[in-house]
């Protein structure tokens, strides 16, 4: 191989390794068998959720995983592999891909990484069933508001009973 090709591949490995290090979550899939229309819809759904989706050679993925300190991820890079990276939302790649896989049997989830830990297909599917960040924040907010609301109702009830007693 020429030095130019080796340099280009080394650059690709470095770019992918940086993406792996920066990612909040990574989902690895086998998209073999998807139609062009299905692939287009999947990519659009991922892009709308802020997820980067790439088909990358297994040799580059393996070297990048090693460089990123994710050696155990290399076992997923067998056969055609596509990788979804999300730097912000941990749940987005799992949720979009799992939802899409329900309607497209050709899409196979191989596993992934969440906050630096290798995850199985089952863990990816469990993650996909969680609400997104906004949903979790709204649940937390409602839990935090409940005691305040109860105190307000109690104060209102006491005030109303005193008004009734004074009249």
Curated annotation (Swiss-Prot):
Q: Name one GO cellular component term.
A: large ribosomal subunit
Enumerate the PROSITE patterns for this protein. Answer: RIBOSOMAL_L10 (PS01109)
Q: Extract one GO molecular function annotation from the record.
A: large ribosomal subunit rRNA binding
Q: Keyword set for this entry? A: Ribonucleoprotein, Ribosomal protein, RNA-binding, rRNA-binding
Which Gene Ontology biological process is one annotated for this entry? translation
Q: Belongs to which family?
A: Belongs to the universal ribosomal protein uL10 family.
The function of this protein is: Forms part of the ribosomal stalk, playing a central role in the interaction of the ribosome with GTP-bound translation factors.
User: How does this polypeptide assemble, per the annotation?
Assistant: Part of the ribosomal stalk of the 50S ribosomal subunit. The N-terminus interacts with L11 and the large rRNA to form the base of the stalk. The C-terminus forms an elongated spine to which L12 dimers bind in a sequential fashion forming a multimeric L10(L12)X complex.
User: What is this protein identified as?
Assistant: Large ribosomal subunit protein uL10
Q: Which organism is it from?
A: Streptococcus thermophilus (strain ATCC BAA-250 / LMG 18311)
């Amino acid at each position: 191989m020429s030095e130019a090709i080796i340099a280009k591949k080394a650059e690709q490995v470095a770019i992918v390794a940086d993406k792996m290090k920066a990612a909040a979550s990574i989902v690895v899939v086998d998209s073999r068998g998807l139609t062009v229309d299905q692939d287009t819809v999947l990519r659009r759904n991922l892009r709308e959720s802020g997820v980067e989706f790439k088909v990358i050679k297994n040799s580059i993925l393996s070297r990048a995983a090693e460089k990123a300190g994710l050696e155990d991820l290399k076992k997923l890079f067998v056969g055609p592999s596509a990788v979804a990276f999300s730097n912000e939302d941990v749940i987005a790649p799992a949720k979009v891909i799992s939802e899409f896989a329900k309607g497209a049997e050709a899409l196979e989830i191989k596993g992934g990484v969440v906050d630096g830990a290798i995850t199985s297909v089952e863990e990816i599917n469990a993650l996909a069933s969680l609400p997104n960040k906004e949903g979790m924040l709204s649940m937390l907010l409602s839990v935090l508001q409940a005691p305040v609301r109860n105190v307000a109702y109690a104060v209102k009830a006491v005030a109303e009973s005193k008004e009734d007693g004074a009249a």
